[in-house]
Amino acid sequence: MSQTQSLAVKTRAGLGKGACRKLRADDMVPGVYYDAKGVNVPVMVEHLPLQKLYSKIASSHVFDLQIEGETKPALVWKVEHHPTKPRITHVDFYGVDLTKEIQVRVPVEVVGKSKGQVKGGQLEIHREFIEVLCLPLVIPDKIVLDITNVDINESILIADVVLPEGVKAVYDNNYAVIGVLASAAEAAGEGA
Protein backbone atom coordinates (compact mmCIF):
# COMPACT_ATOMS: atom_id res chain seq x y z
CA MET A 1 0.00 0.00 0.00
CA SER A 2 1.55 3.29 -1.04
CA GLN A 3 -0.06 5.59 1.51
CA THR A 4 -0.37 4.74 5.19
CA GLN A 5 -3.85 5.19 6.63
CA SER A 6 -4.32 6.80 10.04
CA LEU A 7 -6.93 6.73 12.79
CA ALA A 8 -7.21 8.96 15.85
CA VAL A 9 -8.33 7.42 19.14
CA LYS A 10 -8.62 8.75 22.68
CA THR A 11 -7.84 7.02 25.93
CA ARG A 12 -10.85 6.24 28.09
CA ALA A 13 -11.23 6.06 31.83
CA GLY A 14 -14.59 4.31 32.11
CA LEU A 15 -14.35 0.53 32.01
CA GLY A 16 -17.04 -2.12 32.18
CA LYS A 17 -20.38 -2.76 30.53
CA GLY A 18 -22.13 0.45 31.62
CA ALA A 19 -19.35 2.75 30.46
CA CYS A 20 -19.12 0.93 27.11
CA ARG A 21 -22.89 1.19 26.55
CA LYS A 22 -22.69 4.92 27.19
CA LEU A 23 -19.88 5.27 24.63
CA ARG A 24 -21.84 3.32 22.02
CA ALA A 25 -24.88 5.55 22.61
CA ASP A 26 -22.62 8.53 21.79
CA ASP A 27 -21.54 6.86 18.50
CA MET A 28 -18.16 5.85 19.93
CA VAL A 29 -16.61 2.38 19.86
CA PRO A 30 -14.76 1.11 22.94
CA GLY A 31 -11.52 -0.72 22.37
CA VAL A 32 -8.12 -1.68 23.67
CA TYR A 33 -4.69 -0.92 22.26
CA TYR A 34 -2.22 -3.73 22.98
CA ASP A 35 1.33 -2.42 22.80
CA ALA A 36 4.07 -4.63 21.32
CA LYS A 37 5.76 -4.44 24.73
CA GLY A 38 2.70 -5.76 26.60
CA VAL A 39 1.06 -2.50 27.75
CA ASN A 40 -2.75 -2.40 27.38
CA VAL A 41 -4.47 0.97 26.93
CA PRO A 42 -8.29 1.28 26.96
CA VAL A 43 -9.32 3.54 24.06
CA MET A 44 -12.40 4.91 22.33
CA VAL A 45 -12.83 5.83 18.68
CA GLU A 46 -15.56 7.41 16.58
CA HIS A 47 -17.58 4.77 14.75
CA LEU A 48 -17.59 6.23 11.23
CA PRO A 49 -13.81 6.75 10.81
CA LEU A 50 -13.21 3.27 12.26
CA GLN A 51 -15.75 1.70 9.89
CA LYS A 52 -14.16 3.45 6.88
CA LEU A 53 -10.65 2.39 7.88
CA TYR A 54 -11.68 -1.22 8.55
CA SER A 55 -13.49 -1.49 5.22
CA LYS A 56 -10.29 -0.37 3.43
CA ILE A 57 -7.62 -2.32 5.28
CA ALA A 58 -9.35 -5.04 7.35
CA SER A 59 -6.81 -6.81 9.56
CA SER A 60 -3.95 -7.17 7.13
CA HIS A 61 -2.43 -3.69 6.89
CA VAL A 62 -0.40 -1.57 9.23
CA PHE A 63 -1.78 1.92 9.81
CA ASP A 64 -0.87 4.88 12.02
CA LEU A 65 -2.83 4.87 15.27
CA GLN A 66 -2.82 8.30 16.90
CA ILE A 67 -3.30 8.06 20.66
CA GLU A 68 -3.47 11.44 22.39
CA GLY A 69 -1.05 12.99 19.86
CA GLU A 70 1.39 10.08 19.75
CA THR A 71 1.54 8.05 16.51
CA LYS A 72 2.10 4.28 16.69
CA PRO A 73 2.10 1.63 13.95
CA ALA A 74 -0.77 -0.80 14.55
CA LEU A 75 -3.05 -3.47 13.11
CA VAL A 76 -6.78 -3.92 13.65
CA TRP A 77 -6.50 -7.18 15.58
CA LYS A 78 -10.06 -8.11 16.51
CA VAL A 79 -13.43 -6.57 15.70
CA GLU A 80 -16.79 -7.41 17.29
CA HIS A 81 -19.95 -6.59 15.35
CA HIS A 82 -23.51 -5.97 16.52
CA PRO A 83 -25.58 -9.11 15.83
CA THR A 84 -28.31 -7.33 13.82
CA LYS A 85 -27.00 -3.87 12.91
CA PRO A 86 -24.09 -2.95 10.65
CA ARG A 87 -22.07 -1.59 13.59
CA ILE A 88 -18.75 -2.33 15.20
CA THR A 89 -19.26 -2.75 18.95
CA HIS A 90 -15.66 -3.30 20.09
CA VAL A 91 -12.20 -3.18 18.54
CA ASP A 92 -8.74 -4.36 19.56
CA PHE A 93 -5.66 -2.72 18.09
CA TYR A 94 -2.26 -4.40 18.17
CA GLY A 95 0.85 -2.23 18.21
CA VAL A 96 3.59 -3.69 16.03
CA ASP A 97 7.34 -3.41 15.95
CA LEU A 98 8.12 -2.76 12.28
CA THR A 99 11.43 -4.66 12.57
CA LYS A 100 9.98 -7.93 13.95
CA GLU A 101 7.99 -10.58 12.10
CA ILE A 102 4.38 -11.16 13.13
CA GLN A 103 1.90 -13.93 12.42
CA VAL A 104 -1.33 -12.86 10.67
CA ARG A 105 -4.20 -14.40 8.72
CA VAL A 106 -4.36 -13.43 5.04
CA PRO A 107 -7.43 -14.15 2.88
CA VAL A 108 -7.21 -16.60 -0.03
CA GLU A 109 -8.61 -15.65 -3.45
CA VAL A 110 -9.23 -18.44 -5.94
CA VAL A 111 -8.97 -17.49 -9.64
CA GLY A 112 -9.69 -19.45 -12.80
CA LYS A 113 -11.73 -22.56 -13.47
CA SER A 114 -9.99 -25.85 -12.83
CA LYS A 115 -9.68 -28.73 -15.30
CA GLY A 116 -11.64 -30.79 -12.81
CA GLN A 117 -14.54 -28.33 -12.75
CA VAL A 118 -14.66 -28.34 -16.56
CA LYS A 119 -14.98 -32.16 -16.37
CA GLY A 120 -17.85 -31.85 -13.86
CA GLY A 121 -15.92 -31.90 -10.59
CA GLN A 122 -16.75 -29.76 -7.58
CA LEU A 123 -14.37 -27.17 -6.11
CA GLU A 124 -13.84 -27.51 -2.36
CA ILE A 125 -12.26 -24.54 -0.57
CA HIS A 126 -10.77 -25.93 2.64
CA ARG A 127 -9.15 -22.71 3.88
CA GLU A 128 -10.38 -19.16 3.33
CA PHE A 129 -7.38 -17.75 5.20
CA ILE A 130 -3.72 -18.74 5.46
CA GLU A 131 -1.57 -17.97 8.50
CA VAL A 132 1.65 -16.26 7.43
CA LEU A 133 4.75 -14.94 9.17
CA CYS A 134 6.30 -11.73 7.83
CA LEU A 135 7.33 -8.18 8.65
CA PRO A 136 4.32 -5.91 9.26
CA LEU A 137 4.93 -3.74 6.19
CA VAL A 138 5.00 -6.69 3.73
CA ILE A 139 1.72 -8.34 4.75
CA PRO A 140 -0.01 -9.26 1.48
CA ASP A 141 -3.58 -8.06 0.79
CA LYS A 142 -4.53 -11.57 -0.27
CA ILE A 143 -3.02 -14.80 -1.49
CA VAL A 144 -4.12 -15.59 -5.04
CA LEU A 145 -4.41 -19.25 -6.05
CA ASP A 146 -4.66 -20.02 -9.77
CA ILE A 147 -6.56 -23.32 -9.98
CA THR A 148 -6.68 -23.78 -13.77
CA ASN A 149 -4.35 -26.84 -13.71
CA VAL A 150 -6.08 -28.66 -10.83
CA ASP A 151 -7.83 -31.85 -12.00
CA ILE A 152 -10.42 -34.07 -10.32
CA ASN A 153 -9.15 -35.58 -7.03
CA GLU A 154 -6.22 -33.15 -6.91
CA SER A 155 -5.47 -30.46 -4.34
CA ILE A 156 -3.24 -27.47 -3.81
CA LEU A 157 -1.29 -28.06 -0.60
CA ILE A 158 -0.03 -25.27 1.63
CA ALA A 159 3.59 -26.21 0.81
CA ASP A 160 2.82 -25.64 -2.90
CA VAL A 161 1.38 -22.14 -2.44
CA VAL A 162 3.65 -19.47 -3.93
CA LEU A 163 3.97 -16.56 -1.49
CA PRO A 164 5.53 -13.12 -1.98
CA GLU A 165 9.15 -12.59 -0.99
CA GLY A 166 9.60 -12.30 2.77
CA VAL A 167 6.31 -14.09 3.54
CA LYS A 168 6.28 -17.64 4.96
CA ALA A 169 3.26 -19.88 5.54
CA VAL A 170 2.86 -21.11 9.12
CA TYR A 171 1.79 -24.76 9.40
CA ASP A 172 2.60 -27.99 11.21
CA ASN A 173 1.02 -30.37 8.68
CA ASN A 174 1.00 -29.96 4.90
CA TYR A 175 -2.77 -29.42 4.54
CA ALA A 176 -4.91 -28.90 1.43
CA VAL A 177 -5.99 -25.31 0.81
CA ILE A 178 -8.33 -26.20 -2.06
CA GLY A 179 -9.27 -29.40 -3.87
CA VAL A 180 -11.46 -30.60 -6.71
CA LEU A 181 -13.64 -33.62 -5.98
CA ALA A 182 -15.59 -35.82 -8.35
CA SER A 183 -19.28 -34.98 -8.41
CA ALA A 184 -21.67 -37.36 -6.64
CA ALA A 185 -22.93 -38.69 -10.00
CA GLU A 186 -19.39 -39.42 -11.20
CA ALA A 187 -18.45 -41.07 -7.92
CA ALA A 188 -21.57 -43.30 -8.10
CA GLY A 189 -20.78 -44.16 -11.75
CA GLU A 190 -17.25 -45.27 -10.88
CA GLY A 191 -18.52 -47.52 -8.09
CA ALA A 192 -20.97 -49.37 -10.40
From Swiss-Prot:
Keywords: Ribonucleoprotein, Ribosomal protein, RNA-binding, rRNA-binding. It comes from the Bacteria. It holds the Pfam family Ribosomal_TL5_C. Coiled coil: none annotated. The keyword Nucleotidyltransferase does not apply. GO terms for biological process: translation. Signal peptide: none annotated. GO terms for molecular function: 5S rRNA binding; structural constituent of ribosome. The keyword Acetylation does not apply. One of its GO terms (cellular component) is cytosolic large ribosomal subunit. HAMAP family: Ribosomal_bL25_CTC. This is one of the proteins that binds to the 5S RNA in the ribosome where it forms part of the central protuberance. Part of the 50S ribosomal subunit; part of the 5S rRNA/L5/L18/L25 subcomplex. Contacts the 5S rRNA. Binds to the 5S rRNA independently of L5 and L18. Belongs to the bacterial ribosomal protein bL25 family. CTC subfamily. NCBIfam families: bL25_bact_ctc, PRK05618.3-1. This is Large ribosomal subunit protein bL25. It comes from Solidesulfovibrio magneticus (strain ATCC 700980 / DSM 13731 / RS-1).
